[in-house]
């Protein structure tokens, strides 16, 4: 019987073990999409305790705790840090079968070195004290953990109005070699249907010194901010497309739509689609001219619990998978961007695994001549960021495209302890390829498949994003 979380965790064939230990394990981490707070990296934040680094802001854990009957006070409320950690420790034994159980113990093992001990009510105090003592050390600050985990690059998620002063501070610090680059997340600039849109237009106009009245004014304001981001090393954009829309409109129509919204009027769904299409097509061309990568995260159904949204706000664990069709609108959006050969490198993620084959085939329609893997089907996202979800995504990518050109894993996380998700991903990748070899579906060619694993673990992403390390 295999031991839980051994050095050969998930590596159930000899070939998988060789792939992982000889090719994957020592590869650096290129974390091209995350939600780490850049100010904590800039100031080399020292975490107060295990709650501060591990549970604070983690909606995955809160969701599991609520399911386990834990009161909200112990999730997001006013309980002490220890009380919240104790409640999490009492929940962990009930998470077997959930990726949280694997993540929890991988994160305790690295970087804290906790092995052979499972988190539970009986072990909580010992783990709390041990890890808190380690967090007082210099190698367990925000930067220290990144260095321990062999991180080479992180891409944070940033709004166009952000001043990026923290990224600038990190870039100017010659004692810290890890690249910390902004990613452009302009959702607030095109989600015209939201009540917050007009206030955001005022803020965008202020930071860009632009009076936004016409669609061309919005383009001017965004261009100035794109230039600002580019000056700070940005090469990546990210868009939350909860619903994919497409409806064309000329500039005069877009001017009218924007003017009506700024006047406080409510728009039709068709007008919303026209405006979003106009912004996304224009932005895509800007990305292409600048050599940026665009990411589309598709299919989240957000803020389902209105009572809790009013109490706690967004991004606290009340989101789920949407089932709106996306194929036709996405095809038209990408095709429109491609008309003038201004479709940038693009990564598509779907939250509904039903859409895996849709994206797996969609990327094949728009691959670029002379550019390996220009269009990417992104790694299993959010609810698919688990063993079965990763296997499904990679299997379908292999069957419908080229797994060998895949840019691999990203944490998409707010926690400095989430880098072990790259280890988890690499183990699953090696397990999958090892089984192909075991079943005679792939040759037992270690150099060939080892190079493929190495590329997916690091090199493909480094080359794709073209960021000098």
UniProtKB/Swiss-Prot annotation:
The keyword Isomerase applies. Pfam families: UxaC. Keywords: Isomerase. It catalyses: D-glucuronate = D-fructuronate; aldehydo-D-galacturonate = keto-D-tagaturonate. Pathway: Carbohydrate metabolism; pentose and glucuronate interconversion. One of its GO terms (molecular function) is glucuronate isomerase activity. Transmembrane segments: none annotated. Its EC number is 5.3.1.12. Gene3D superfamilies: Metal-dependent hydrolases, uronate isomerase, domain 2, chain A. GO terms for biological process: D-galacturonate catabolic process; D-glucuronate catabolic process. Belongs to the metallo-dependent hydrolases superfamily. Uronate isomerase family. This is Uronate isomerase.
């Amino acid at each position: 019987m295999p031991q839980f979380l051994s050095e050969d965790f998930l590596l159930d064939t000899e070939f998988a073990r060789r792939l992982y230990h000889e090719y994957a394990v020592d590869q650096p981490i290129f974390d091209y999409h995350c939600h780490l707070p850049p100010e904590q990296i800039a100031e080399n934040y020292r975490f107060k305790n295990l709650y501060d680094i591990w549970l604070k802001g983690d909606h995955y854990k809160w969701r599991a705790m609520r399911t386990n009957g834990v009161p909200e006070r112990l999730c997001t409320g006013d309980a002490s840090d220890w009380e919240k950690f104790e409640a999490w420790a009492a929940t962990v034994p009930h998470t077997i079968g959930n990726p949280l159980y694997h993540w929890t113990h991988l994160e305790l093992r690295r970087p804290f070195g906790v092995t052979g001990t499972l988190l539970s009510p009986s072990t909580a105090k010992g783990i709390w004290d041990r890890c808190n003592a380690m967090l007082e050390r210099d190698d367990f600050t925000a930067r220290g953990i990144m260095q321990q985990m062999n991180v080479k690059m992180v891409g944070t998620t940033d709004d166009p109005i952000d001043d990026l002063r923290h990224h600038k501070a990190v870039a100017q610090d010659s004692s810290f070699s890890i690249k910390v680059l902004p990613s452009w997340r302009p959702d607030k600039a095109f989600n015209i249907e939201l009540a917050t849109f007009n206030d955001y237009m005022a803020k965008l106009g202020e930071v860009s010194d632009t009076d936004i009245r016409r669609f061309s004014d919005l383009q001017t304001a965004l261009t100035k901010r794109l230039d600002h981001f580019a000056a700070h090393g940005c090469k990546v954009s990210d868009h939350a497309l909860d619903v994919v829309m497409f409806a064309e409109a000329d500039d005069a129509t877009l001017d009218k739509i924007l003017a009506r919204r700024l006047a406080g009027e409510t728009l039709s769904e068709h007008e919303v689609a026209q405006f979003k299409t106009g912004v996304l097509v224009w932005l895509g061309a800007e990305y292409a001219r600048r050599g940026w990568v665009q990411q589309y995260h598709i299919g989240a159904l957000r803020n389902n619990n209105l009572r809790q949204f009013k109490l706690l706000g967004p991004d606290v664990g009340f989101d789920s998978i949407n089932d709106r069709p996306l194929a036709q609108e996405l095809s038209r959006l990408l095709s429109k961007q491609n008309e003038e050969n201004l479709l940038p490198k693009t990564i598509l993620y779907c939250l509904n695994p039903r859409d895996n084959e849709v994206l797996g085939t969609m990327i094949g329609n728009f691959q670029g001549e002379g550019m390996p893997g220009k269009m990417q089907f992104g790694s299993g996202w959010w609810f698919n960021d688990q063993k079965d979800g990763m296997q499904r995504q990679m299997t379908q990518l292999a069957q419908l495209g080229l797994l060998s050109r895949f840019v691999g894993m990203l944490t998409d996380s707010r926690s400095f302890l989430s880098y072990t998700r790259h280890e988890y991903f690499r183990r699953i990748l090696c397990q999958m390829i090892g089984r192909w070899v075991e079943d005679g579906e792939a040759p037992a060619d270690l150099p060939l498949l080892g190079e493929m694993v190495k590329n997916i673990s690091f090199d493909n992403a480094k080359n794709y994003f073209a960021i000098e390390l």
